[in-house]
């Protein structure tokens, strides 16, 4: 598609996105080449239609009338947009996994993810997002919920998986998710799978 023809298709696609949605260059690669996409996004940013969060990452910002300012994008949404741009599979790990699973109320100082891509670290205002490479078997071919729970269990450590933790994880999962996890987590480290079997209650 010629560059002169790509503005309306890109702008139209963005206008159909919900407020707060984050998007990246690759989301429009079927409409134009990267250079043309960047020009369109730069023009839309200049017109105040979109917000540039960081290089190559944009959103349709949500305005909070009460605060009189735009709402900051959620770090997890930024992380997944970056991953989508590179074609990575990512899963929250460490304190990030604990926070997202409701096992910790502490907001992570660094939003940390395991990834099947290269190691990368990004600074977005006051937000630090870090991707660590890991073995594919820990994150591929399993559901995002199973992968998240494996990482949360690993972050806590064997001795800190109490009955309270097990019950909290149960409460954060559906019956179908536990059935899937019982099957998907078979190749996790043995002690982690033992804890997952407790969570799943021997689901089959």
What is the role of each PLM region?
Residues 53-56, 83-125:
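Short gly/ser-rich loop at a beta-strand->alpha-helix junction or flexible surface loop bordering the NTP-binding
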Residues 81-82, 93-95, 155-160:
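Positively charged, aromatic-accented nucleic-acid-binding surfaces
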Residues 123-133:
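A short, charged helix-loop
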Residues 133-204:
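Hydrophobic alpha-helical interaction segments
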